[in-house]
Amino acid sequence: MKMSEIRRNVPVNEQIQLLKRGVVDLVSEEDLKRKIEKGEPLRVKLGADPTRPDLHLGHAVILRKMRQFQDLGHKVIMLIGDFTATIGDPSGKSKTRPPLSLEEARANAESYLAQCRLILRQEPEALEIRYNSEWLEQLGYKDIIGLAAKYTVARILERDDFTKRLSAGTPISMHELLYPLTQGYDSVALHADVELGGTDQLFNNLVGRALQRDYGQEAQVVLTLPLLVGLDGTEKMSKSLDNYIGLTDEPHAMFAGLMKVPDPLLDNYFTLLTDLPRERIEELLAGHPVAAHRELAREVVRAFHPDADLDAAEARFRSVAKGGIPDNIPAVSVPASELNEQGHVSMAKLVVLAGLEPSNGAARKLIQNRGLKLGGETYSDPQGQLTREQLTEGVVIQKGKDKFARLVLEG
């Protein structure tokens, strides 16, 4: 996102109104106001277990809120839960989440942080990056027992997902009961003034607030934001559900994705992903949905790709929407070594090489379900092959409405 000047000495009430935009829970507004009135930069924490290294616009909702704190002169702490990822956060889950190794968590964190930098300020006074293994690995058994003694099992089991699992007879492991305490202890270690999270993290963040009091600290303010609903209009945005728009998507792909946002979600997307004033949002929502989608797409793409040619992205979207094939499709080189003895290569393998599917099995399923086109025509043979001659000339394959690849034989 484009860097702006840090706005210091903004009136307290103005800061509160800006920071409340899009917020679901604020515990409490009075505490936040009192902390800001002290005139010192707040320490604003966001904890993330790097289980998936690729971020999407759903993650951007909270990262944008962190950026707002930064732009007001506060310091945000990006806490990588490399240690807690080895436990597995059960928040909002109907079953135990498989843990990661420390090595896996730290490898994922590198990609995670690189994408966070698309939104967050990088100045040392605005950003601090920490790993909770710094202090959690140092805790001994006595420390853990002491931490566990500060909360009752009854209070932990008040959490909605645990209640549902108990009712369903689904097992809950002891390590899962410790997770909220472990996450809460992070706030103690960091002396956090504010903690951000999705609505599914409200319970855990309130545990942190309570633990800070137990450890003689001033309790953090807890601020939660909604989980962005994905392009399917029903489930939260998720890569595994393929209803997402990635933070690193090309401008044309991001534009096309935003044009597909279901009409009932436009208000939410405008509020959470843009800085447009409320009056302008209501004006757009009262008009034609296509115009509102266009404004949303241009605003969001401009934020993540300040130098992008928005007119070109829109023109490509319109061309594809009419069934056309764009001119500037990225070329994918097909190594000659992929050809068999007859000079053929399977379409499934080409789909994987183009990055349209992760595996040959997924590619064959895509083809079988008539989700792939070759040269604008539906391609439906999951065992089909292309020839050396076809690839030498170059062919265009298409998944869905807006994912294209031009395949050309290397050399």
UniProtKB/Swiss-Prot annotation:
GO terms for molecular function: ATP binding; RNA binding; tyrosine-tRNA ligase activity. Transmembrane segments: none annotated. It is found in: Cytoplasm. Gene3D superfamilies: HUPs, RNA-binding S4 domain, Tyrosyl-Transfer RNA Synthetase. InterPro entries: aa-tRNA-synth_Ic, Rossmann-like_a/b/a_fold, S4_RNA-bd_sf, SYY-like_C, Tyr-tRNA-ligase, Tyr-tRNA-ligase_bac-type, Tyr-tRNA-ligase_bac_2. Catalyzes the attachment of tyrosine to tRNA(Tyr) in a two-step reaction: tyrosine is first activated by ATP to form Tyr-AMP and then transferred to the acceptor end of tRNA(Tyr). The keyword Translocase does not apply. Residues 345-409 form the S4 RNA-binding domain. Belongs to the class-I aminoacyl-tRNA synthetase family. TyrS type 2 subfamily. Its EC number is 6.1.1.1. A motif ('HIGH' region) lies at residues 50-59. This is Tyrosine--tRNA ligase. Pfam families: SYY_C-terminal, tRNA-synt_1b. A motif ('KMSKS' region) lies at residues 236-240. GO terms for biological process: tRNA aminoacylation; tyrosyl-tRNA aminoacylation. GO terms for cellular component: cytosol. Keywords: Aminoacyl-tRNA synthetase, ATP-binding, Cytoplasm, Ligase, Nucleotide-binding, Protein biosynthesis, RNA-binding. It catalyses: tRNA(Tyr) + L-tyrosine + ATP = L-tyrosyl-tRNA(Tyr) + AMP + diphosphate + H(+). ATP binds at K239.
